[in-house]
């Protein structure tokens, strides 16, 4: 894989001319120019190679044409706004000795014109050892990228009551996933595109997780009392105005990702494998988007003592940061999955429950002084 923090110039191996485009013109063509031409600007020559899934790249104009990217137009190369899932904007860059072959997703390769067509670039069928199809990628600038931090691999357990009946409201956030997202895939209305690629070619997407007390789950029970209660889970955030329009995917009710092309352009569909692997978020198998939900539950106190009960949910927080040497958070969405709901109580009878896994009721009754009838109810309820 080519370096992801480099700005490149792309020149033809046969004629030494450079791939260039014009400033301020939408859908302008990519042609070959002499580096010393009077009407050429340094930015016309600079390209950023954003890696995507399947070892392909999006070739992006660096600070020219508002981050326009290469796309195919009748076997010619134009630049246009990036659009997720647009196959004509995807390129494979294959090493060929000291140079590279640049192949479109349609199978044809970048070929320099000859003779009267010397300044043209076209897509043609690949031919062996054709110098007009060989390209030099010269690094002309290095971009500072953030260092990947240490990622936690296991979430801490949810809080439990202390022997005196105290309990925390939750646990501290743990960084469980981290990845870089190309700026062309991010809708950031607070920065213009030309500034964006020069200062923030990559955004940082983080996944934090932690336990938090579920709203409505705190229940006090008298001896031998049974109660119904309602707790909340899901998300209160309008996903359309946050993650969908910012990154081009949504979180569905099963906490999985569903990718789509956002109305504002961009989108991360082309790096969904990367997001799946580095953020540890599965693809959704549901059609219903995550919203705020209320869940009915019931708890029973089978003992002769008063009991308190509290439920905890795993909170997943996805946070997007603009990075230009320091981090500025521009998006956050927090969700909780009902499948993570866990209940703890006081007194929690933890010792008795553990003993019941490998001791008889009579043995546990003798050790804990909890009546056999109560132990049976505890086992029925908690197991």
UniProtKB/Swiss-Prot annotation:
Q: Name one Pfam family in it.
A: Toxin_10
InterPro entries recorded for this chain?
A: Ricin_B-like_lectins, Toxin_P42
Q: What is this protein called?
A: Insecticidal crystal protein Cry35Ab1
Coiled coil start-end: none
Q: What induces it?
A: Probably part of the cry34Ab1-cry35Ab1 operon.
What biotechnological or industrial uses does this protein have? Expression of the 2 toxin genes in transgenic corn confers resistance to WCR and has been commercialized.
Subunit composition and interactions: Monomer in solution. Copurifies from parasporal inclusion bodies with Cry34Ab1.
